[in-house]
């Protein structure tokens, strides 16, 4: 375990857990009410998410894996030799492993980092890797947020001047509103691609499926309910780390709600009360959730061709390559900064 821990670099600019209660309070004090995504990615939350995302009906993961297994050799051709490759969100490396194996086969000198908020999940991820297979690809991990990772690439001697390739798998960009997705990509580009724009890129996945039945089956698959409710236990821990005082949330008061928003082209995930008014506890006991009120915690935007081009263009990026396989709604795109 000591060897594994030595591979993990702490790049946190602040302890993100400290800010989550403030984000929870702010989100529940507005209309419509929301909960921050960070609340859902505790160690327990991530384990439930992995169970959910590996369910048979959760097509995004299965389609990503099909594409990566079929097209990884082509995809690594787009990654420059001597690159630093960062997976911005590595709850599981099963999707990245085909890419690492293809990079090793190409004999490119690559330094790969898995980035995650959870130290324990990074430990688990690194323990599962077959290091003996890799001679050209060096493997490590970064403990921090997306923002920490991008800043680390920009500022770190010995890293900042090398080509960068950032992986945004798992439909990560779809979790942001369309304007915020463009800003997110623009921030990555200006900080992590600008030093070597010709050789640096983003590899991301997007989903074009707008068939309500397929989407709803996926996002109500096994594991999603415990994933959603684990956030409430995590919230209780953050508001009362010593387990003293009244709980903010009673998980037994809540249902998970899954909806397709046809007008906005997105899936919406919310928590609702079990048909009754709920007053929160502890420091949030002045907040009341009405019986028909939704607390949204996640959206997954789907992108058709026109929406993709608006997204990339608004971020100052251009898609230079695309990879998919027949029958898949998911595709991977290589993005680079637009020439001046």
Curated annotation (Swiss-Prot):
GO molecular function, one term: methyltransferase activity
Protein keywords: Alkaloid metabolism, Methyltransferase, Transferase
Signal peptide: none
Disulfide bonds: none
Catalysis performed (reactions): 4-(3-methylbut-2-enyl)-L-tryptophan + S-adenosyl-L-methionine = 4-(3-methylbut-2-enyl)-L-abrine + S-adenosyl-L-homocysteine + H(+)
Top-level taxonomic group: Eukaryota
One of the GO BP terms on file: indole alkaloid biosynthetic process
Keyword Transferase assigned: yes
Matching Gene3D superfamilies: Vaccinia Virus protein VP39
Pfam family, one: Methyltransf_33
InterPro entries: EgtD_Methyltrsf_superfamily, MeTrfase_dom, MeTrfase_EgtD-like, SAM-dependent_MTases_sf, SAM_MeTrfase_EasF-type_put
Presence of keyword Lyase: no
Broad class of enzyme this protein falls into: transferase
Pathway of action: Alkaloid biosynthesis; ergot alkaloid biosynthesis
EC number: 2.1.1.261
Family stated for the protein in its record: Belongs to the methyltransferase superfamily.
Subunit organization: Homodimer.
Record function comment: 4-dimethylallyltryptophan N-methyltransferase; part of the gene cluster that mediates the biosynthesis of isofumigaclavines, fungal ergot alkaloids. The tryptophan dimethylallyltransferase ifgA catalyzes the first step of ergot alkaloid biosynthesis by condensing dimethylallyl diphosphate (DMAP) and tryptophan to form 4-dimethylallyl-L-tryptophan. The second step is catalyzed by the methyltransferase ifgB that methylates 4-dimethylallyl-L-tryptophan in the presence of S-adenosyl-L-methionine, resulting in the formation of N-methyl-dimethylallyl-L-tryptophan.
Annotated protein name in UniProt: 4-dimethylallyltryptophan N-methyltransferase ifgB
Organism, scientific name: Penicillium roqueforti (strain FM164)
UniProt gene name: ifgB
């Amino acid at each position: 375990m000591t060897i594994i821990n030595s591979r993990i670099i702490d790049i946190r600019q602040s302890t993100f857990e400290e800010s989550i209660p403030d984000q929870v309070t702010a989100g529940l004090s507005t209309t419509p009410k929301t909960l921050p995504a960070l609340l859902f990615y505790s160690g327990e939350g991530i384990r439930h998410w992995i169970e959910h995302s590996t369910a048979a009906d959760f097509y995004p993961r299965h389609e990503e894996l099909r594409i990566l297994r079929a097209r990884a050799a082509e995809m690594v051709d787009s990654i420059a030799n001597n690159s630093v490759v960062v997976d911005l969100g590595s709850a599981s490396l099963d999707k990245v492993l085909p890419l690492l194996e293809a990079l090793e086969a190409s004999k490119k000198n690559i330094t790969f980092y898995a980035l995650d908020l959870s130290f324990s999940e990074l430990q688990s991820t690194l323990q599962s890797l077959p290091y003996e297979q890799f001679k050209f690809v060096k493997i490590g991990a970064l403990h921090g947020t997306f923002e920490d990772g991008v800043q680390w690439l920009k500022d770190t001697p010995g890293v900042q001047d090398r080509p960068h390739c950032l992986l945004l798998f798992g439909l990560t960009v779809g979790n942001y509103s369309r304007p915020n997705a463009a800003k997110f990509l623009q921030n990555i580009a200006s900080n992590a691609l600008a030093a070597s724009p010709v050789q640096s890129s983003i590899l991301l996945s997007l989903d074009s499926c707008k068939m309500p039945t397929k989407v709803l089956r996926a996002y109500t698959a096994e594991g999603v309910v415990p994933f959603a409710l684990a956030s409430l236990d995590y919230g209780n821990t953050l508001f009362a780390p010593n387990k003293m005082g009244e709980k903010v949330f009673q998980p037994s008061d809540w249902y998970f709600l899954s909806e397709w928003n046809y007008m906005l082209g997105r899936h919406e995930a919310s928590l609702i009360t079990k048909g009754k008014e709920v007053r929160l506890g502890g420091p949030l006991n002045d907040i009341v959730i009405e019986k028909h009120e939704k607390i949204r915690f996640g959206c997954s935007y789907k992108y058709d061709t026109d929406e993709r081009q608006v997204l990339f263009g608004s971020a100052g990026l251009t898609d230079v390559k695309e990879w998919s396989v027949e029958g898949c709604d998911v595709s991977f795109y290589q993005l680079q900064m637009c020439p001046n």
